[in-house]
């Protein structure tokens, strides 16, 4: 499942021209990350802490690192799980149960938290920056986000990309609530029939807004797997905030999505 989310932020208000947006960015998990802090004080000391936390989480769920916890467990069923690993597994199984098995943390190759790991890492970075006194931030890893507060009194904004053959605007923009939200998108815009092998599907992408990036990440995958009808039904029964882009470029949303203002 390819995750695509076009992200962008508003320009500064003219009255805040002296304020500096701090941006700590780099590469992790085979993708990029960016942590933006909109405070008048400098938080340069956070950069190394952020990098260390991202690397620490990588050594929990990365299936590409032979020495990661998940790799060691997949090679030794008797290995004791850490509390962190167990929590990821239990959250995965919770989403699996609520989605009728559409989200699975294990396949024939063993445990795999790829569809929940980036969201979990975002939540851990949010905990870190808040513990260090940051109240206004925008965290993005591989197109998934979590934000809180504002960008110098302006809302943070995120955009959902439309398919490349759409005749409508290339993205749909939404304000992020100032009390905080996490956003994750799952989908495939260019070759959905290649991925699924069953001709064109009715659904191109699913975007989930949730208080937790971990849950947003997992739910976006599960609902995309379910497809439009079952996905919308599952979203409604679980009170989720979900925005669907259909194969024809149109969109539908769950009733709770209205809480996310355009």
Model-identified regions with their sequence ranges:
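Sec-dependent signal peptide recognition
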Residues: 2-8
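Mature catalytic core of soluble alpha/beta enzymes
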Residues: 8, 15-262
